[in-house]
Amino acid sequence: MQESEKLARAWIDGWNAGKPDDIPLATDFVHSSPFGTVSGREKYLDWVRPLAEKNVTSLKIIRTVSSDSESAIWFEMGTPNGVVQCCDWVKIERGKIIAINSFYDATNLRE
């Protein structure tokens, strides 16, 4: 298994375990999603924790495609309103996740 896939899976596993602080995010981590772009690990975690508590009931990995430094992870996000198909493009450097671009329909999610 590629290191990028291991880190992409750690991303999903950290949220499922309710331990986002344990996810190996770089200090200068950048996350882009339908809600916008957030830069900085702590700023991202402070912003996303309450959103995840309201909107995410489960995450189930369907498939990954990986190279040395990037991984696409397709997963289902369980929400109070049903299941949302998601794909995250995860970039890594030096054993940390440096960026994620998330693709999903946010129509039924609350900010």
Question: Where are the language model's segments positioned?
Answer:
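C-terminal and inter-domain tail/linker signature
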Residues: 1-111
